[in-house]
Design a protein with these regions (language model features):
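Signature of lipid phosphatidyltransferase scaffolds
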Residues: 213-229, 240-242, 453-528
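PLD/PLD-like phosphodiesterase catalytic module centered on the HKD motif
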Residues: 3, 107-121, 126, 147, ...
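Conserved small/polar residues in nucleotide/adenosyl-binding loops
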Residues: 26, 43, 599-606
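N-terminal non-catalytic structural scaffold regions of very large proteins
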Residues: 2-378, 396, 564-566, 578
């Protein structure tokens, strides 16, 4: 299969720009007036959370490339500097649409629904003002730490993603002698962090019975900010927020202890290079100039925002009581028929493979599989991979119990699961303390497979039970994300699962596989061979179809292979959740390819 002619840069979409298109699709859900109002709030919050991570990881990585003098182009022919320039334009446009959606569509609709968001503390009634001031004195003031900047106090370190209020203050003519060096009328900079330990969305009395009124914590602080600087006049005060480079740089070959090295790098995450500054669009120019200078940030990375900073807080508004009529009813996963009224999960699996489709089917059988294995006296060993788990994970508890019950328990905990590193370090230590053998995977690779192997002693001998799945062993997100899994005791899967764990924990590399296709060594070649098979079928006039679901499609060889298949007449149907670097509809190249966005499940059919 000669793919050379299909690997030209004009046939590919830049990875980062494709991701921004994905976030735009999520934003389109927030703009869709056919959806329940509070669902739209949730989607808008998700777009903001997505954009935060995009800047902290992807934009940060591109800036690192520019700083390092890296000039090579990506598969779409763009340098890092060119990508950053285009990203700045696109993200400013996206943020503009976010706030237009909030201000022109969502807030008016919320008002009609009886939910009032006080945009400015100046709009409070007398009764609301009294409540807010009392709330400040009782709950907020004791937590605040105002910090000034002068010759003896340098600009303070501002943590990543924190919301802060910057102020320009001027010493009063008649004041105490605390700051003798400050001249009356001279402008000074001060800042105070909006405490993340306090609720950002605060409910206050409503004008009308039955309505709900909320105000943001930063508005409460702004209203009372003069109480933090008693000897000074507050000239202006405005919120701001920064985003820092949060991508971990770990040399796994040099690291003597991966867990310790990741812990060390995590401490640096809060203090990486500032890559984005968000401010109110009405911020005093003198204050803005100070922030841009101190953070050493370019104009292209400043976002002047018409509304509250950090829209992830809308998830708190979504959670307000009394508005169920404006939300999609919570879906209740259906019980898995094979496991109903059955206490012995192993007997069910022996009777036949069981396919699970989450969240439509309950995740309980997966949890119960590990729980029963932990208690079953005939179970000799449990092996499992963990990427992301819930905060109070029943899976972790069951694995710890299994080890305490004397079973051989081996767990691969992926320490490099982005933004779950700290959680996974905690779980790894807990499992080790319980007696589990904890491993961290292969150097230079993330282990993203979801696999559990239970080795059980039975009358006929040793039998291996396997659970394979997409997604995570996370009982919370399993109620939200679309994933699939299978239970089996087919010995071919058992042999393959054993080989996977031996490869992860030691130096064993299987020569062949019975049923599994494992990345990164074997999967790409297998997919390319399947693509070529369909292309040959099309050439012979035989039925030829490729239908695939995936998280992202970025690999240039796979994309070129799909172009080749399309040019041979193969119908290609792609469901791609996020990034898609493939261009559809290119004459002679991808005319037979149809690609749409979708949810989390990954599957491949040829």
């Amino acid at each position: 299969m000669d793919l050379g002619k299909f690997e030209k840069k004009e046939y590919f979409v830049n990875r980062e720009l494709s991701w921004l298109k994905f976030d735009e699709r999520v934003l389109s859900e927030a703009r869709d007036k056919n959806l329940p109002l509070f669902d739209r709030l949730k989607f808008l919050s998700i777009t903001a959370s997505n954009l935060d991570e995009f800047f902290m990881v992807r934009v940060a990585s591109l800036k690192d490339q520019v700083h390092a003098g890296y000039h090579k182009t990506d598969i779409a022919g763009m340098t890092a500097k060119e990508q950053l320039k285009e990203i700045s334009v696109r993200t400013h446009e996206l943020v503009h649409v976010q706030y237009n959606t909030l201000n022109r569509s969502l807030i008016p609709a919320l008002e009609k629904a009886g939910m009032h968001l006080v945009a400015a503390h100046e709009n409070l009634t007398e009764a609301q003002s009294a409540f807010v001031d009392r709330y400040f004195e009782d709950n907020v003031y004791p937590v605040l730490t105002p910090m000034a900047m002068d010759s003896s106090r340098p600009f303070p370190l501002i943590r990543n993603k924190t919301l802060n209020i910057g102020a320009l203050i001027s010493k009063k003519e008649k004041s105490d002698k605390l700051n003798k060096k400050d001249k009356a009328g001279e402008l000074l900079f001060a800042t105070v962090q909006v405490p993340s330990v306090l609720p950002r969305v605060v409910q206050i009395p409503s004008k009308k019975d039955g309505d709900t009124t909320v105000i943001l914590l930063e508005e409460i602080i702004e209203r009372n900010i003069d109480k933090l600087f008693l000897s000074y006049d507050v000239i202006c005060a405005h919120p701001y927020r920064i985003m820092r480079n949060a991508d971990l740089t770990i040399d796994e070959d040099e690291a003597e202890d991966l867990l310790v090295e990741i812990q060390r790098q995590l401490k640096k995450r809060q203090w990486g290079e500032v890559i984005r500054l968000e401010v109110e669009d009405k911020m005093d120019e003198r204050l803005l100039k100070i922030l841009k200078t101190e953070f050493d940030i370019k104009e292209a990375d400043v976002f002047e925002i018409n509304g509250p900073l950090d829209l992830t807080m809308l998830m708190k508004v979504y959670g307000a009581d009394g508005f169920d009529a404006y939300k999609t009813p919570r879906y209740q996963p259906a019980p898995v028929p094979e496991f109903q009224n059955e206490k012995d999960i192993f007997q069910v699996i022996r009777e036949g493979d069981v396919f699970l489709h989450h969240p439509y089917m309950s995740f309980d059988p997966v949890v119960n599989f590990v729980r029963q294995a932990a208690k079953d006296p005939d179970v000799l060993a449990i092996k499992q991979t963990l990427y992301r788990v819930s905060g109070n994970s029943p899976i972790i508890a069951a694995l710890a119990q299994a080890a305490e019950n004397g079973k051989q328990v081996s767990v691969l905990v992926e320490l490099k699961a982005r933004f779950d590193e700290e959680n996974n370090i905690v779980w790894a230590k807990k499992l080790e303390k319980a007696g589990c053998h904890v491993i961290y995977g292969l150097v230079g690779l993330k282990t993203h497979s979801k696999i559990t192997l239970v080795v059980r002693r039975e009358e006929t001998g040793i039998r291996r039970y396997v659970h394979l799945a997409t997604g995570n062993y996370n009982d919370s997100t399993a109620k939200l994300y679309t994933d699939c899994g299978i239970f089996t005791c087919d010995e071919r899967f058992g042999e393959d699962a054993t080989a996977v764990f031996n490869m992860l924990s030691g130096y064993s590399e299987p020569k062949s596989w019975n049923k599994l296709i494992v990345a990164p060594i074997w999967m790409k070649d297998r997919f390319l061979s399947l693509i070529e098979r369909e292309a040959e079928n099309a050439k012979k006039g035989l039925p030829a179809l490729i239908r695939a679901k995936m998280n992202s499609l970025c690999d240039p060889k796979i994309i070129a292979g799909l172009y080749y298949a399309s040019s041979c007449g193969v119908q290609v149907e792609l469901l791609v959740r996020g990034i898609c670097c493939l261009k559809v509809g290119v004459p002679g190249i991808s005319e037979n390819i149809h690609a749409v966005s979708y949810t989390h499940l990954r599957a491949h059919e040829t």
